């Protein structure tokens, strides 16, 4: 028995040479595969963050998921706050590529003052079905979902629920742990677009974020279900403000108020969110760095969405389209989820402004096409 214990103490990860371990990325279309070379892999392979996260943990999801039909995926994740520094040779070029030339020396800006948003309360409700703003936050001192332990995940849940239970007024609400829900209750919340999906997404599974499901996961929402917080899905926290119709101003107002209150409640508990002046708010996926903000509307645009210039219009407006049910879905009945393409290098107010102005223009184009008119005079300049 002593011999076995002695052997266990000396156990190290058995790996072959970097050449033999380097993944085959020849069929891949994601940001990680564009950047990672064998030389870089060799250089980064023997590094680990203080929590033991390695380059193989960073890239696994991008190896297992070569590409995506709708969007160019990032193909990597962070396991902790230090990942972005320890593996910066890989992650800096990916961040620059994904975030429109954002340089390693650039500094991020934050603006959560809803008074700085112009308009936004007048999107046409005949076209705009619902409006939503979300972001993610990571709690300092814990590993991120791809690498956290069961105990850490439960610690994040406990701390979050204690903070959220202190919210009052129209933000007052209740926490619902996933493990206490029936399948029918879960499915109803998913169908109503309130809850994250069951862990079927290959991006979630391959990165290790679905371990121990549903332990430590849940949803907190206010009584009217217009302010929600997801706990321990892709990020420690996803903060969401949403409602039916086109009043993005109201949605953003609630978002800023609630988010600021939550941050204060965490500070009162002696902890803070992961943030630095270069990357802004640090989150699991490099695509969400900076603001972590996605302002989206479900909008009925059956005509413009079939137009030859639709993709070009979106690109110029710095907008992204998704299917009706989110990132892995197709559009139903010409209804698309239209949101800001950027997260980093722009402030929260600037991103919501782009969505408000851009969606207004898309609705204007849709109305012209309904009448059989040309939209050439409405073509926007590149933002």
From Swiss-Prot:
Its domain of life?
Eukaryota
Q: Which residues form each disulfide bond in the chain?
A: none
Composition-biased stretches, type Basic and acidic residues, lie in: 99-112
Task: State which Enzyme Commission number(s) the record gives.
Answer: 2.7.3.2
The free-text tissue note of the record is: Exists in many tissues, but preferentially in testis.
Q: Which protein family is named in the record?
A: Belongs to the ATP:guanido phosphotransferase family.
* Purpose of the protein: Reversibly catalyzes the transfer of phosphate between ATP and various phosphogens (e.g. creatine phosphate). Creatine kinase isoenzymes play a central role in energy transduction in tissues with large, fluctuating energy demands, such as skeletal muscle, heart, brain and spermatozoa.
Protein known as: Creatine kinase, testis isozyme
Source gene?
tck1
């Amino acid at each position: 028995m002593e011999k076995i214990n002695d052997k266990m103490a000396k156990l190290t990860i058995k790996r072959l040479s970097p050449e033999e371990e380097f993944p085959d990325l020849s069929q891949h279309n994601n940001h990680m595969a564009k950047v990672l070379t064998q030389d870089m892999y060799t250089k980064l392979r023997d590094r680990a963050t203080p929590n033991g996260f390695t380059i193989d943990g960073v890239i696994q999801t991008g190896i297992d998921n070569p590409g995506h039909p709708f969007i160019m995926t990032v193909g990597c994740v962070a396991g902790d706050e230090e990942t972005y520094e320890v593996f910066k040779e890989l992650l800096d070029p990916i961040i620059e590529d994904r975030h429109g030339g954002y340089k390693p020396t650039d500094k991020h800006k934050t603006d959560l003052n809803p008074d700085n948003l112009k308009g936004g309360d007048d999107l046409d409700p005949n076209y705009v079905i619902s409006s939503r703003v979300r972001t993610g936050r990571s709690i300092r001192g814990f590993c991120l979902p791809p690498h956290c332990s069961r105990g850490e995940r439960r610690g994040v849940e406990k701390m979050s629920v204690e903070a959220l239970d202190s919210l009052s007024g129209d933000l007052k609400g209740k926490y619902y742990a996933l493990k206490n829900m029936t399948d029918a209750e879960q499915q109803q919340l998913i169908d109503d677009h309130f809850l994250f999906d069951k862990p079927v997404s290959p991006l979630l599974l391959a990165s290790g974020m679905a371990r121990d499901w549903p332990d430590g996961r849940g949803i907190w929402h206010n009584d009217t279900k217009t302010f929600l917080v997801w706990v321990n899905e892709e990020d420690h926290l996803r903060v969401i403000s949403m409602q039916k119709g086109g009043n993005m101003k109201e949605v953003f107002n609630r978002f800023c108020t609630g988010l600021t209150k939550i941050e204060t409640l965490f500070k009162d508990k002696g902890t803070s969110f992961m943030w630095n002046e270069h990357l802004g708010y640090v989150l699991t996926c490099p695509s969400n760095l900076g603001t972590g903000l996605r302002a989206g509307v479900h909008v009925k645009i059956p005509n413009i969405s079939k137009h030859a210039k639709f993709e070009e219009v979106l690109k110029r407006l710095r907008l992204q389209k998704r299917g009706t049910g989110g990132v892995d879905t197709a559009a139903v009945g010409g209804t698309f989820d239209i949101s800001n393409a950027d997260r980093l290098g722009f402030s929260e107010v600037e991103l919501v402004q782009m969505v408000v102005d851009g969606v207004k223009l898309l609705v204007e184009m849709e109305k012209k096409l309904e009448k059989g008119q040309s939209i050439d005079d409405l073509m926007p300049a590149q933002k």
